[in-house]
């Protein structure tokens, strides 16, 4: 009896451990196809929980109908096959085009890929309970231990995967390992055979199946979701990272694009640091050039490094500039040096930590002429970097006339995040001291695009800025400033909220972007 209980505890531990590994891996393996957002994790958690729930119900029926050890063995074997199927299915379905919105597409993908493995793993515990309970007088003790070991497996699976396994093994190697562990568990604990000859036959067949599946797995499942222009692919602790060759906006120059999850974040021309392909980065540069001309100093803090496109250009433009970059992912910083043209002996100071943590703990009060927020994208906005409290912390590090700049991807007509973020900054910097700068003069009729929000407690003389860049650049001007009166009218017309640490519904505010950018697709 004691031996059976120990065996049962090990089995439920393994099943729960593997379930949580699959759940955490799901977010990473889906990222190149649908990004990482609240909607992605909502679908993953919901589908996995639904699978476990239905699996527990079906497992109870199976346990009563087939109360023998081989039932457990076949479930462990099937769950191993299910784990091995995740990567091939992701490659197959992730590339498919669905005539539906992105949110529904995410739900469809997660259901097809993760429901069956979760459901089979959910069947295991009821079968284990049925096979273990022989003495009703000790039911509470036995069931309590089973639940304890099951929960322990979930806990260790969570921490081991998040803190260690993904960064050490990568998602596809990890899924391969999970599949093999479950299949081996079927052989060790499953009771699939009781006599020596059938055992030998089964082991031979199982070995052939495992080797065949491993070959198929490596042949197709390890095929990364990349094209022939992608020459670097890696999963870091924070992103799925890709670097690919692409043409610049003028379609004349080859550049290197840094892709974080699904989104091209930076485009760098390796031997031309002054090439700024993105319009919003050119707006940043125009504002800094104007400020440098007027004050002669340029101390800049970047929240989000990405490809270090503007920092490396500023280093050459202004040899006396102080440039600090806070980039949470040290692997991105390494790639910037190795592939994206940032020299090893750079004057740029990099800090690999969370942007808010850095700002909150910085002793450099009143140091910076500019703080540049470049950590937002359309599908995944770090909500803790959008709040009034964080804006107050950034304002502390700015000089009295220092300027905060942040790029925001939103729809002018339908967007809810942009007006909310502007109103939030007005709470800190004052009404009339926050400005909206667009790369196109017809800013009100453009759809989803990247705009720059500019804020300063002493105000920014945008008329002088516009005059300066007009004189210097003429037709090459990129920055188009919305008149303050029109901006205030816009804020009145659009629904918005003040974003605080207590209430920051960023994913709900960006939902219109999903509908407009990833609505019904036709191909």
Predicted segment positions?
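Class I SAM-dependent methyltransferase core
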Residues: 302-305, 327
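Glycine/threonine-rich flexible loop motifs
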Residues: 379-386
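Glycine-rich SAM-binding Motif I of class I
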Residues: 304-312
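Short alpha-helix immediately C-terminal to the canonical SAM-binding loop
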Residues: 333-334
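Class I SAM-dependent methyltransferase Rossmann-like catalytic core
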Residues: 267-291
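Short, solvent-exposed loop/turn elements at domain surfaces
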Residues: 250-254, 265-269, 462-464, 498-499
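Alpha-helical transmembrane segments of multi-pass membrane proteins
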Residues: 1-233, 245-254, 262-265, 289-298, ...
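SAM/dcSAM-binding transferase cores
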Residues: 242, 447-523
């Amino acid at each position: 009896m004691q031996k059976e209980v120990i065996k049962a505890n090990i089995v439920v531990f393994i099943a729960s451990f593997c379930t949580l590994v699959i759940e955490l891996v799901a977010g990473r393996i889906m990222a190149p196809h649908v990004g990482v957002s609240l909607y992605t994790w909502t679908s993953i958690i919901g589908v996995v929980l639904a699978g476990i729930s239905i699996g527990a119900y079906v497992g109870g029926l199976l346990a009563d109908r087939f109360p023998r050890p081989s039932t457990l063995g076949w479930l462990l074997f099937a769950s191993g096959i299910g784990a091995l199927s995740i990567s091939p299915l992701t490659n197959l379905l992730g590339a498919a085009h669905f005539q539906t919105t992105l949110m529904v597409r995410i739900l469809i993908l997660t259901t097809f890929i993760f429901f069956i493995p979760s459901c089979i793993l959910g069947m295991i515990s009821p079968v284990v309970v049925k096979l273990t309970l022989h003495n009703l007088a000790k039911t509470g003790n036995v069931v309590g231990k089973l639940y304890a070991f099951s929960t322990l497996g979930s806990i260790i699976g969570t921490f081991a995967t998040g803190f260690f396994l993904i960064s050490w093994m990568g998602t596809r190697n990890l899924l391969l390992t999970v599949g093999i562990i479950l299949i081996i568990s079927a052989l060790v604990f499953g009771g699939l055979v009781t006599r020596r000859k059938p055992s030998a036959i089964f082991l031979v067949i199982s070995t052939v199946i495992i080797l065949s599946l491993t070959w198929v797995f490596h042949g197709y499942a390890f095929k990364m979701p990349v094209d022939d222009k992608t020459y670097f692919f890696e999963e870091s602790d924070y992103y799925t990272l890709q670097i690919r060759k692409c043409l610049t906006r003028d379609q004349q120059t080859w550049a290197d694009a840094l892709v974080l999850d699904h989104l091209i974040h930076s485009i760098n021309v390796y031997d031309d640091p002054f090439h700024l392909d993105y319009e919003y980065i050119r707006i940043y540069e125009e504002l800094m050039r104007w400020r440098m001309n007027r004050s002669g100093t340029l101390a800049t803090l970047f929240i989000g490094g990405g490809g270090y496109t503007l920092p490396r250009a500023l280093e050459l433009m202004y040899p006396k500039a102080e440039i600090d970059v806070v980039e949470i992912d040290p692997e991105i910083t390494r790639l910037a040096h190795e592939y994206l043209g940032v020299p090893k002996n750079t004057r740029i100071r990099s800090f690999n930590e969370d942007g808010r943590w850095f700002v909150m703990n910085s002793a450099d009060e009143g140091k910076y002429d500019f703080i540049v927020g470049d950590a937002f994208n359309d599908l995944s906005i770090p909500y803790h970097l959008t709040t009034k409290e964080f804006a107050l912390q950034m304002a502390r590090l700015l000089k009295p006339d220092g300027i905060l700049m942040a790029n925001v991807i939103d729809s002018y007509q339908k967007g809810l995040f942009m007006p909310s973020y502007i109103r939030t900054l007005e709470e800190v910097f004052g009404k009339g001291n926050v400005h909206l700068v667009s790369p196109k003069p017809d800013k009100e009729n453009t759809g989803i695009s990247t705009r720059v929000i500019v804020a300063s407690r002493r105000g920014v003389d945008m008329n002088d800025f516009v005059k300066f860049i007009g004189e210097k650049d003429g037709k090459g001007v990129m920055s188009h400033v919305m008149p303050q009166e029109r901006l205030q009218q816009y804020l009145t017309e659009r629904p918005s909220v003040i974003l605080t640490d207590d209430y920051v519904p960023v994913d709900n505010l960006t939902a219109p972007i999903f509908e407009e950018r990833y609505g019904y697709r036709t191909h």
